[in-house]
Amino acid sequence: MSSSHRTPGPERRAAPGVTHVLVGFSKGVLADLDDLLPAGAVLVLDEPDVIKARGALEKAKAHPCVAGIMAAATQDEPHAERLTELLDRPPRVQAVIPAVEYGVVGAAVLAHAWGLPGAGPAAARTLRDKIAMRAAADASGLAQPQWAIAETVHDVEEFRERHGGRCVLKPANRQASLGVRVLGPDDSAAEAWQHCTHADEPMLRARYALPGRYLVEQRLNGPEVSVEALVHSGQVGFTNITAKAVQPGTSPVEMGHVVPAGLAPGVEASLAASVRELVRITGFQYGVLHSEWILVEACRPHLIECAARLPGDSIDLLIDLAYGGRFTGDYLAVLEGRGPIPPRQKRGAAAIRFLTAPTGTVREITGRELASALPGVQEVTLSVASGTTIAPVTSSWSRPGHVIATAPDGRQAAQQAAAAASLITFEMDEEMAWP
């Protein structure tokens, strides 16, 4: 770690009551931990840039579980071992939790150094780098799209030509579909390259963070699913399969999820075997794996990507609603070394539907109360308000809100969520065409 990445400060010690260290600031994870841990139990580590950009010091005051926030070079992945020079092992520490994608490596390194359960540094580094993950999957024979490293737009054009005029371009170390572009024969590779290589998350990433790397992949056809698996000592325990709906067009952003997916038993067995193989080839030890797959011919899993952290898009809440219990609590149990989490039976189904809106400036949003009153609706959330300018949805961060609903089965839950979402209307001061 260069001196410019160090965060000087007199404190190497956490507050006496700290039992859990969170690598990365996440309001969602902290809200869960407020319910699961006593006040003052959590120390949050994050980049100085991110702490400032997100107003984390002020926002943390709303979370009783937070003992403090410490600035640290959590995203300096090549030198993550130096995090141990910043912070002494808290005497009562029970777990280190990666709260965000960019904290996965730092959390794994701290857990390993402190003798606590974690992903393992090597596994974390593989799973944070889509190129490394693709290479590991190729070496094991795990089914996945054909792929290549892309260093120029010419690489994209050549790959597309070799694969029937279709491909997917993506960053190797981002999240939330940020920068991902789906290309057909007539789509501009130059425009896609410009979009992909300039996509960033300045609110979430340090200014010095690793430079972008890119890969281009074969486009596969078939339903998309994700698998959320709790792993203990390299063994897969509780597992859920989530069905996904992805918006059409060049930006494949997820617009809905259903838990559980309700697949045929044979397909579920194939996915389970693929996840076990993914655990084996990465050497993943303790935590949660959120892996995404395309079912070619609706039955053959092909790996798309995998994250070694809690899933986003409220999938953890959908799991809670469909199975009972607390998925985040089970995750803590694994990271605290309290043993494996066994499979359990579903008791219903849950679905999330993300809202869509015209592009332009919002004048008024109506229908929220009507949507909330529908049977089975559990949550209606808006992420925009009057005066907000809405752009096209190009990543998970640009969706204007969502609805969550429950029902006895997945089809009904999805229908209820869609019906509620249809009642919410965005009135615009002016609708605008977007370049």
Q: Model-flagged regions — what are they?
A:
Residues A137, R160-V182, E201-G222, V227, ...:
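ATP-grasp fold ATP-binding core
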Residues A113-G179, E201-L204:
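A conserved helix-loop-beta module that forms one wall/lid of the active-site cleft
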Residues Q218-F284, V288, L295, L303, ...:
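ATP-dependent carboxylate/phosphate-activation module, predominantly the ATP-grasp catalytic core
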Residues A333, G339-G376:
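A glycine-rich beta-turn/hairpin centered on an aromatic-Pro dipeptide
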Residues M1-A123, H154, G339, A357, ...:
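ATP-binding N-terminal substructure of ATP-dependent carboxylate-amine bond-forming enzymes
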Residues A143-P145, R166-L169, D186-N221, P252, ...:
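Conserved ATP-binding module of the ATP-grasp superfamily
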Residues C196-T197, G367-R368, Q416-S422:
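Short amphipathic alpha-helices in soluble, non-transmembrane regions
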Residues L289, A371-I390:
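A structural supersecondary motif
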